[in-house]
């Protein structure tokens, strides 16, 4: 079925048009024309605009504001609109009604993917048109407009697909607004390390900023790495527009498969184990590939010029990436973790009643594999200096495995023991293990409390400044593994009780 014949898309289009699009388009036109008027005024009376040295510089500034508004409307506004539409229609039962029609899952998903955000799409087209006029009047290369629009619309499709999966996972539309707010607040912090943080390529801020630079500046060496240079993937320069597109495409295929599967059968997991590992692997390798050239396997000794080190503090980069790995892994684990009842039914159908069979299907085994893979990728930064920095690596790798195992065990334990109250008790446990030590450290002004946190040992060890208490951190990691063992025992007990009840019934 073509898109203009898709019943879901047609319905969403009618709803958008019924709500009115003219006012929204006029607002976008006023924004674009205001910026265009600024450029026209500069060309007429350059003396009134002392901040610009040339018409090209003025054009870049006004066009940058135009695409900033376009990103805000199309990517962030579209994400929120699709999420709220899908959550509300699931709550009203319309999603399930559409599933019972002869429509294929791909047709249903594409209708919700491209239909609800049409108002935002019209606004973005208006801004893109005025942006093209600005580029032409400022005598800028048209490739600037083509490249930035390509990046913006590809990012919009990628984030809209994430909105589909989020809408299939949560029925409260407020969660989408909260997710957008968190992303808007967190994203600017990645600008501190422009070419080294993956979020600058998922939302292609680096690629867009790079297109604004003079092409002749791209021939600079790696030591001058900033917004003007190509990112380096394992020390190989890669055009940022291609890097962003390849990253969005590879992840988008996995997200599309998840949306299709969840639409065909709502009892299927959002992400299969193989897809979870593939997604985690793509994100992890891409992120560590971007920063590998800083140390080139000789961590903590930087392998780049002293000029770069003097102007850029890299000591906190790997700890930040370490924490980001935790956040990314926990999200993927939560999405890929099957419900205990689903695992139990699958095991009973196969007539397997041992804990080994349950372990192979649970999130715990997935967490173990992900932790091992994260440790292997982290080893790339230590491969040539492992003899003198093995303690740092051991602490960071052990911390990665411990965090993922503790989360997976707690997640399933709370589901088994607390049922519908599982999320609240999981949040309580994570707060006590991860954040309470930092609060106690602030209250009592003792940094040792902070190191007890489940998140702290790896971050502290990976800080490039000299550390005298590595043995102490190794002891904390060992204590975390003892906690993991206790949770493992409790996890086994809960599963035995569930299997006993199933056998009795």
Pin down the residues of each PLM region.
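Hydrophobic alpha-helical transmembrane segments of membrane proteins
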Residues: 1-92, 112-505
